[in-house]
């Protein structure tokens, strides 16, 4: 299939959107998947934009109404999502959608209606000549060099454990936890507030995210870590105004919520339990392959110590003499996009694209027949 330009790959996350041209090692553009609209006429009167996206919306968020087109992994505002996709083509990539195919990512268990609407929008609204949709966890697995394994994918909006056999997601084994990076940032704000550190405004959020990403870690044993003297745990952080704050048990209490969601008053199993549950829902002959190939993906799996703690907690409940291995690829923040870049570049993949002619003939239902 010949086109004027290389395929575009878009990883549509709840927190960040990643976009670039297939064949590249990294996405050319990564920014917040948010849209800001002016409050009243103040910015418009000053010559500012009435609508802005990504980093620009983030920088102005205190004076804007902020909306998230994707929540908990699913598109909730189709109008805003279309604005975002058009922005990627027009202002970031500076490409015409009609000149080449696009590969878009989706979470496991994406509702059928959502899949159809995404397909429809790319063909009818953006006018792409060819399209494909691929599950995020499958792409992360490809990027790690595997075709079979259990992917624990935790980004900004949702955490999923997804068993994959020979490149195909096993939907009956997928488990989901509605707790991820955005929730952990909110939780860290609360933990710091409880220690008298008030970083609660919209503009403070970026600071709290930086603290989370720079200093938070997962304890091998939460109770033992809590028993340590505060001096042994202390980290200092300098705020933009020069003030220095001291941080202690908040740094491991925050990501502990991934293992014990009850800390955030959420009645749900933690990541160790959803991984175990996913594996046990699969055929007995596949379980050892999954226990020994647990692949981490997404920014919220990047906390130091998370991989070792996951091995420890899963090994406790796994059948006797079962090898448990967790693989933590260093590039896991972008591994979903990387997998899409690899897949869309393969010569063997070129016959997989849904063409505009096929869409016209079959309709949006074609996505269920071709993308799974």
From Swiss-Prot:
Q: Does the keyword Phosphoprotein apply?
A: no
According to its UniProt record, which protein family does this protein belong to?
Belongs to the actin family.
Report TM segments: none
Name the organs or tissues of expression: Ubiquitously expressed.
* Gene3D superfamilies in alphabetical order: 3.30.420.40, Actin, Chain A, domain 4
Q: What is this protein called?
A: Actin-related protein T3
What PANTHER family has UniProt attached to this entry?
ACTIN
Recite the lineage of the species.
Eukaryota, Metazoa, Chordata, Craniata, Vertebrata
Identify the species of origin.
Answer: Homo sapiens
